[in-house]
């Protein structure tokens, strides 16, 4: 699982090599594939991953074009406001970041974030483990704390977690907040930016296990 390529094709090739080395069953990408680039650039960044013929599930980040949220990329599954089953796991996704004073490319209001999460979860199959793939982390955790000690995650995502209790949430966005935390029984993972060599490896079978590694 990776996040925040920010246009680094080198990081994409390293991610593909890591997936091969670890015999990964799937690759999860939590947004900021580009650094204010086009859908075509996002497709080029994802190409080393889709070439592995593994499931590649992604959401767009706030530094990606909003059009990426609707884009169909060959060999990859766009999870934005969608649910996708793999084995015994339902993956649901939400791209973007909460609206902010920075006015980045792809932002959503907290109201829209909560509505989108709830509606997407309703479309996921019952009886499966539920995994949320989000660009933004939930608010008030170890993994959304900025260098200036501001918790910059989504309050709506936190509300969703408290209500729906997914098994695990994969996220990114806050580069300096690499780590693993919990909200209740839900595991929250921000691996740190893959552009700087970070990733997470997760086993989602009977007992969920997560470890932070380097690509």
Regions found by a protein language model. Give the residues of each.
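Active-site neighborhood of phospho(di)ester-bond hydrolases with catalytic His/Asp-centered motifs
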Residues: 1-3, 27-32, 56-62, 78-80, ...
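Active-site environment of divalent metal-dependent phosphoester hydrolases
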Residues: 6-10, 34-39, 62-69, 99-103, ...
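Core catalytic region of metal-dependent phosphoesterases/phosphodiesterases
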Residues: 7-86
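A general structural detector for well-ordered alpha-helical segments in enzyme core domains, enriched
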Residues: 15, 44-48, 116, 153-160, ...
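Conserved catalytic scaffold of divalent metal-dependent phosphoesterases
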Residues: 20, 64-156, 214
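Binuclear metal-dependent phosphoesterase catalytic core
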Residues: 71, 84-87, 108, 155-164, ...
């Amino acid at each position: 699982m990776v996040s925040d390529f920010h246009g680094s094709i080198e990081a994409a090739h390293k991610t593909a090599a890591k997936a091969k080395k670890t015999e990964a069953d799937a690759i999860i990408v939590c947004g900021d594939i580009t650094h204010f680039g086009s859908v075509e650039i996002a497709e080029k960044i994802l190409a080393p991953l889709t070439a592995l013929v593994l499931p590649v599930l992604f959401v767009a980040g706030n530094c990606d074009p909003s059009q990426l949220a609707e884009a169909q990329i060959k060999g990859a599954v766009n999870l934005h406001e969608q649910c996708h089953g793999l084995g015994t796991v339902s993956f649901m996704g939400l791209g973007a970041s909460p609206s902010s004073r920075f006015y980045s490319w792809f932002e959503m209001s907290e109201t829209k974030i909560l509505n989108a999460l709830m509606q997407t979860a309703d479309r996921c199959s019952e009886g499966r483990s539920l995994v949320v793939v989000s660009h933004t982390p939930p608010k008030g955790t170890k993994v959304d704390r900025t260098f200036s000690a501001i918790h910059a995650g989504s309050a709506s995502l936190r509300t969703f977690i408290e209500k729906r209790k997914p098994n695990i949430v994969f996220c990114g966005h806050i580069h300096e907040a690499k780590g693993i935390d919990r909200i209740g029984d839900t595991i929250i993972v921000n691996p740190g930016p893959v552009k700087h060599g970070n990733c997470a490896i997760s086993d989602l079978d009977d007992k969920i296990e997560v470890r932070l590694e380097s690509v």
